[in-house]
């Protein structure tokens, strides 16, 4: 079962996230004129207007009120294209190796699970489980186009800089019935971690993590709010 879900994650993300990433990275004018998302997906989901996320599709007949428990798959994480090369060209004193990038991705995936478990489980009242079941909603997440201003690496030492943003990322989430595999929703959104008031601020690995927690917390709360609507909370 786990192998099947892992394979589903790899193939699904490769097929769908790429197109959403192109939509989210396009200039606003180009998005409106040339790259409007389709009204319906290949698997029957319908595009819905949502002021809080960039792209959202749902199964209009889905009833999520029957799901009181949530199973969160491991979060797939991918850096912005050529991020490592751009770090070298920027003249940064921090040398980022491929192993450093793998560690950062693992840390981001772990932080995703931690924050979403807190927001959906502890704060939201939904039971977080590790196995499928009739009342278990499966959450399949991915973070793509990850762009970190000051990378957090064990070899970086004390690294910091002044910047107006610690970085940015695009989140992608799908919701499934954990038993049947029926898909209920798909959404993607991009956010940047901005300094309070838009001013330059001192950014380092500690503030990076705090900013990432806030961004993930915002997304987790949005998902929780949508689930609460189905449950009449």
What are these regions (language model features)?
Residues 109, 113-117, 143, 213-220, ...:
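Extracytoplasmic/secreted envelope proteins and their assembly/folding machinery
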Residues 30-110, 201, 225-233:
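A structural "domain/chain start" motif
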Residues 74-78, 143-147, 190:
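Generic short beta-strand segments
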Residues 93-101, 163-164, 179-225:
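Short secondary-structure boundary motifs at beta->alpha junctions and helix caps
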Residues 14-26:
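Bacterial N-terminal signal peptides
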Residues 85, 101-105, 149-154, 193:
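Extracellular/periplasm-exposed beta-strand and loop segments of Gram-negative cell-envelope proteins
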Residues 118, 122-182, 194-203:
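Surface-exposed short loop/turn segments
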Residues 1-10:
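N-terminal secretory signal peptides that target proteins for export/translocation
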